[in-house]
Amino acid sequence: MSAEDTPEADADAAEESEPETARAKLFGEWDITDIEYSDPSTERYITVTPIAHTMGRHADKQFKKSEISIVERLINRLMQTDENTGKKQLATSIVTEAFELVHERTDENPIQVLVSAVENSAPREETVRLKYGGISVPKAVDVAPQRRVDQALKFLAEGVYGGSFKTTTTAAEALAQQLIGAANDDVQTYAVNQKEEKERVAAAAR
């Protein structure tokens, strides 16, 4: 074999390894390609990767959370209660089971359902309190895209907690209900209802 053949072999190996990376799936099951975004303003802040645990790599870096997978951010949100603090393996199993339920009930990629749920649960307006001469006055303001995603994840996690606390509904079932309802923009879903309420209050404060 001549020396000229060696670079071609390396190139072939590189071409073979590239599709392997592209075919990596979340939890070894869900395809992350072909995810569609309906809201251009939040698209760059909803990251989808096949990695669901980055071990706090960006914990001390401001705004770097947008580079973390939206699935991991949802898992982290589910840990933010007294009972679940630090229990990432439990939160991950809840999300994994919920994704299975979402796929069974909708026959869709649960990652796509999650992305749609976040977009539909993200408030566009909210209120801040301004003081004029010692009097607090509510003022409507636009919500930054990154905060919109943060608020959507918060509402989804709160909906799961409320839907599974002291009931026979499991956390995974509650999460599946929240994701499907929010993806369908159902106002009966807690996350969408909270978004509508925030926007209603902001509209009254214009």
Swiss-Prot record:
N-acetylserine PTM sites in chain numbering: S2
Pfam families recorded: Ribosomal_S7 (PF00177)
Sequence segments annotated as region (Disordered): 1-25
GO biological processes: translation
InterPro entries from the UniProt entry: Ribosomal_uS7, Ribosomal_uS7_arc, Ribosomal_uS7_CS, Ribosomal_uS7_dom, Ribosomal_uS7_dom_sf, Ribosomal_uS7_euk/arc
Keywords attached to this entry: Acetylation, Ribonucleoprotein, Ribosomal protein, RNA-binding, rRNA-binding
One GO term describing the cellular component: small ribosomal subunit
Intrachain S-S bonds: none
HAMAP family with a match to the protein in the record: Ribosomal_uS7_A
Protein family membership: Belongs to the universal ribosomal protein uS7 family.
General function of this protein: One of the primary rRNA binding proteins, it binds directly to 16S rRNA where it nucleates assembly of the head domain of the 30S subunit. Is located at the subunit interface close to the decoding center.
Assembly mode: Part of the 30S ribosomal subunit.
Protein name, as recorded: Small ribosomal subunit protein uS7
Species of provenance: Haloarcula marismortui (strain ATCC 43049 / DSM 3752 / JCM 8966 / VKM B-1809)
Organism ancestry: Archaea, Methanobacteriati, Methanobacteriota, Stenosarchaea group, Halobacteria
